[in-house]
Design a protein with these regions (language model features):
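Conserved PLP cofactor-binding pocket of PLP-dependent enzymes
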Residues: 85
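N-terminal glycine-rich flavin-associated loop
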Residues: 25, 51-82, 100, 106-148, ...
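Short clusters of hydrophobic/aromatic residues that line enzyme substrate/ligand-binding pockets
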Residues: 34, 41-44, 91, 112, ...
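Beta-rich nucleic-acid/ligand-interaction surfaces
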Residues: 153-155
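Short glycine-biased active-site loop of nucleotidyltransferases that positions the nucleotide triphosphate
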Residues: 48-51, 93-98
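N-terminal accessory segments
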Residues: 1-48, 77-80
Length: 164
């Protein structure tokens, strides 16, 4: 049997969960890497599919792999869902936040680690823009452009996540 909650009960539950999540994330992230007020989280309410919007409890903006792991561990301990997000340019709702969850922005992971023209491969972090990959590969006569119209903004992590 599913229990139905009143709007006030749901809001109260959301407020409590948000407070718990923020307290836990403050322990593992620098102050500038965590946002939760409505004004600052508005850009994270949707991806390129703007017809549907949901505000997350908070947005984590980690800068290191250790911080990503700490965010995931903290959220798991609280039972808080996490939605990973790159540039948010997708049109399928793949980066749609969970209203009782945390959005994990991976945009700061934007380094190109290696371009190997012989094997025609690139080792990049998930937040690298498609255009940056093409620019790094251009001196070798190579490019990466599965979707040239959005390559200035979309990221390789989003390409992989959305099977672009």
């Amino acid at each position: 049997m599913t229990a139905l909650l009143s709007v006030k009960q749901r809001e109260r539950l959301g407020d409590e969960r948000q407070s718990q999540a923020i307290a836990a994330l403050r322990d593992v992230l620098p102050e500038h890497a965590l946002i939760w007020n409505a004004e600052d989280t508005t850009p994270y309410e949707c991806d390129g599919l703007t017809a549907y919007r949901t505000r997350p409890l908070a947005v984590a903006l980690p800068e290191t792999e250790a911080q990503v792991a700490a965010v995931l561990k903290s959220c798991h301990a609280l039972g808080v869902p996490v939605v990973a997000r790159g540039a948010g340019t997708g049109l399928s709702g793949g980066a749609m936040p969970h209203p009782m969850g945390v959005t994990l922005s991976l945009a700061k992971f934007n380094r190109i680690l290696k371009i190997d023209p012989v094997s025609r491969t690139a080792v990049v972090q998930c937040g690298v823009r498609n255009l940056a990959i093409s620019e790094a590969a251009a001196p070798f006569g190579l490019y990466y452009a599965p979707d040239p119209s959005s390559q200035i903004a979309c990221t390789i992590g989003g390409n992989v996540a959305e099977n672009s």
